[in-house]
């Protein structure tokens, strides 16, 4: 009887990691975007604070702290927080998606798989569908990396950000700021 009980406990413990959640490791993750001004001047920026995870059911939820925008110029960061993102009212952008949890669990350390992930992005009070071409790699027994295979293009007018972009353009005295913004990411998850 003891052998059966120990066997059941051992089976439950071995099964646990496959059912456990994946927690986003913000220190090992990066989300960057490219802005284009004056027609052909491109600059790379990032958000420093990301959080979220993947549930045992495959539900992905990522939160981007918009106040953590980092353009390497503090005045520009402040203007983006106030004039573009309006972080007093909209403090985060949220991404949610559903992935095949079994496919993630089946990956062995060192293996990777390409996925098309359909999700939604909520930004500035607007929610829009989002298609993401990603590579998912099992980097260790309890670590996953999810990387954009192609940039995701976010169009400012779809999220009612065009007026904010125009305000930034005017205050900076620029001839133009692009409304289509390529976004790339590397998300590191630790199994919890």
Features from the language model and the residues they span:
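Short amphipathic alpha-helical "recognition" segments used for binding
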Residues: 6-7, 81
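Low-complexity, acidic/polar, glycine-enriched regions of mature
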Residues: 20-192
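Bacterial N-terminal signal peptides
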Residues: 7-15
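Positively charged n-region of N-terminal signal peptides that target proteins for export
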Residues: 1-4
């Amino acid at each position: 009887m003891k052998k059966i009980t120990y066997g059941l406990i051992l089976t439950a413990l071995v099964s646990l990691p496959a059912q456990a959640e994946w927690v986003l490791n913000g220190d090992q993750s990066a989300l960057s975007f490219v802005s284009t001004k004056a027609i052909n001047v491109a600059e790379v920026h990032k958000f420093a604070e990301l959080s979220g995870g993947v549930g045992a059911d495959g539900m992905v939820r990522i939160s981007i702290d918009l106040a953590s925008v980092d353009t390497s110029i503090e005045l520009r960061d402040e203007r983006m927080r106030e004039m573009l993102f309006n972080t007093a009212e909209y403090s985060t952008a949220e991404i949610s998606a559903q992935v095949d949890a079994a496919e993630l669990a089946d990956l062995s350390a060192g293996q990777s798989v390409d996925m098309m992930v359909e999700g939604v992005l909520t930004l500035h009070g607007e929610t829009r569908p989002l298609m993401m071409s990603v590579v998912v790699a099992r980097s260790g027994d309890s670590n996953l990396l999810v990387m954009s295979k192609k940039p995701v293009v976010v169009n400012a007018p779809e999220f009612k950000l065009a007026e904010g972009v125009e305000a930034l353009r005017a205050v900076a005295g620029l001839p133009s700021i692009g409304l289509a913004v390529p976004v790339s990411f590397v998300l590191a998850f630790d199994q919890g």
